[in-house]
């Protein structure tokens, strides 16, 4: 991976939450967006009012849960990712 995140941005690879073997095929617009993913890259954090950097609480490799409509989808090296602010992450697996 040759992609570096800036500020408090987090790069996430979405994880599918289970495949249905249903014969009914929904269009992409009707499918629920993933809300679980694996952290691929994190930025260094943001600066507070004193000029000190606030470190990130999320680490590469962690599995996280995030808001359904959070972030922006990007494509890098023929793979799709989601870039979001750390504050859009609501939990991580312990």
From Swiss-Prot:
Biological function: Together with the chaperonin GroEL, plays an essential role in assisting protein folding. The GroEL-GroES system forms a nano-cage that allows encapsulation of the non-native substrate proteins and provides a physical environment optimized to promote and accelerate protein folding. GroES binds to the apical surface of the GroEL ring, thereby capping the opening of the GroEL channel.
Protein location: Cytoplasm
Complexes and interactors: Heptamer of 7 subunits arranged in a ring. Interacts with the chaperonin GroEL.
Main location class: cytoplasm
Family: Belongs to the GroES chaperonin family.
Source organism: Ehrlichia canis (strain Jake)
Alphabetically ordered keywords of this record: Chaperone, Cytoplasm
Pfam families in alphabetical order: Cpn10
GO MF entry, a single one: protein folding chaperone
Origin: domain of life: Bacteria
SMART domains in UniProt: Cpn10
Claim: Ribosomal protein is one of the keywords in the record: no
GO BP terms, alphabetized: chaperone cofactor-dependent protein refolding
Record's protein name: Co-chaperonin GroES
Keyword Signal: no
Record-level GO cellular component terms: cytoplasm
Coiled-coil residue windows: none
């Amino acid at each position: 991976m040759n992609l570096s995140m800036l500020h408090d941005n987090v790069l996430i690879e979405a994880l599918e939450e289970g495949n249905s073997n249903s014969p009914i095929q929904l269009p992409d617009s009707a499918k629920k967006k993933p809300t679980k993913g694996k952290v691929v890259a994190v930025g260094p954090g943001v600066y507070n009012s004193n000029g000190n950097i606030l470190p990130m609480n999320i680490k590469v490799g962690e599995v996280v849960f995030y808001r359904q409509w959070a972030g922006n989808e990007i494509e890098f090296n023929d793979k799709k990712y989601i870039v979001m602010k750390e504050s859009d992450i609501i939990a991580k697996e312990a």
